Amino acid sequence: MRAVIIAAGQGSRLREVGSPKPLVQVRGRPLIAHVIDDALAAGVTEFVVVTGYEAAKLECFLAEIAGARGVQLRCVHNPAFLSPNGLSVVAAAPFVEERFLLLMADHLFDPSIIQDLIAGSPRDAELVLAIDRRLDNPMVDLDDVTRVDVAQDGRIRRIGKALTKYNAFDTGIFLASPGLIRAVREDVAQGGGGSISEGVLRLAARGLAATYDIGDRFWIDVDDAAALNRAENIQVCK
């Protein structure tokens, strides 16, 4: 299984701690090292990392970790890293011809989420999003999290940070297909912003966006200093 890791953004909310954000340390290791190691533990064998802001610094570290881990890792540069994150997924298009994992460089998670997401996902969906139904999860920043409205059959109805009616959170862990890339391109062509969520919305409108409930397992979006402090102090972040 191949994983695409989005690591292109500026990470302005963590800049006072370190830059670029994927190299900010959590428990003695850079964020992106946690993501790569946890994906490896879940059975991922190849990586495509989309870089952008401070790409040279990040790519130097990634070359080191690829050599140390003995894994196949390719970097793809997204010069439009200030644009919505869906364009980083589009940048990886030449290297994803089939189903792939889509991960965020600043999201930490229990590796078993990936294993079960792959094993239990419906084949008729173009995308499956790992969701957290714990609306009181103390690890979640309610002011920043992407919210999801999930139908009874597990399909996504709506997704976005501004939703007022929702029953789950987006964990930033996806099992995707090239259909997501087509959906993002379609969104841009029709005047949309081209975010991942906008691509998911287009798939959802066709009944092609499903979900996987992670239960009570750990995940956190390390997007600011407060989240970094939570990640440093949670036992599962090793």
Tell me the role of every PLM-derived stretch:
Residues D110-V188:
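Conserved core of the sugar-phosphate nucleotidyltransferase
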Residues P22, Q72-R74, R155, L208-A210:
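Conserved beta-strand segments of alpha/beta enzyme cores
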Residues M1-A3, N167-K238:
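Conserved alpha/beta core of the MobA/IspD/sugar-nucleotide pyrophosphorylase nucleotidyltransferase superfamily
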Residues E98-L108:
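Short beta-strand-to-loop acidic/aromatic patch adjacent to the donor-nucleotide binding site
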Residues M1-V17, L208:
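N-terminal nucleotide-binding beta1-loop-alpha1 segment
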Residues R2-I5, R29-R99:
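Conserved N-terminal catalytic core of the sugar/cofactor nucleotidyltransferase
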Residues R13, K57-C60, N85, S112-I113, ...:
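Phosphate- and divalent-cation-binding pockets in alpha/beta enzyme and binding domains
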